[in-house]
Amino acid sequence: TLITPLNDSFIDFDLLAHIDANGEKITGPSVYSEMVWNARQLRAQAGLSAIDWIVVRNRLGAQRMVNKEKMERAINNLSKRIGFRTAPGFNERVIFRELFPRGLTLLDLKDIGVKQLNISNIAARQELRDLIKALELPGVSPDF
């Protein structure tokens, strides 16, 4: 399984595919997609199972914006064209920025003495559960 986090920006999208100035028409694959394609070919030649490629939108804003909707359409169109799945991603949250420099994740909160989660932390944990479910990894379930 290959998980590719993608910030909600056409700047980052350009690593997957080139797109026209309107953000609507995919004009061709880009460097990262070509790398994954090559890896898939090598695995097939070696008789190995296919790579399950999943693109996850990262740092989503809470507001409804035109660019956000264009990104969603572009990712869905590209997924059909080059063969990856999409999974629910993570919203932009302060908790992620606070935990990262300390080498911690949401699952470490109890271990560092957090007794009661605020509503944002609860929502972030649900996003993590949704992602784990979407990955469909054998023997893995979000039991936290």
Task: Describe the role of every protein-language-model region.
Residues G89-R93:
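Cell-surface, membrane-associated systems
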Residues N77, I95-F96, L128, A134:
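Broad hydrophobic/π-residue packing in well-ordered secondary structure
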Residues T1-P88, E98:
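Conserved catalytic-core segment of NTP-binding enzymes
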Residues I26, E98-T105, K133-L137:
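A general structural signal for short secondary-structure boundary/capping elements
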Residues F100-I122:
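C-terminal boundary of histidine-terminating zinc-finger modules
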Residues Q126-P142:
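C-terminal alpha-helix
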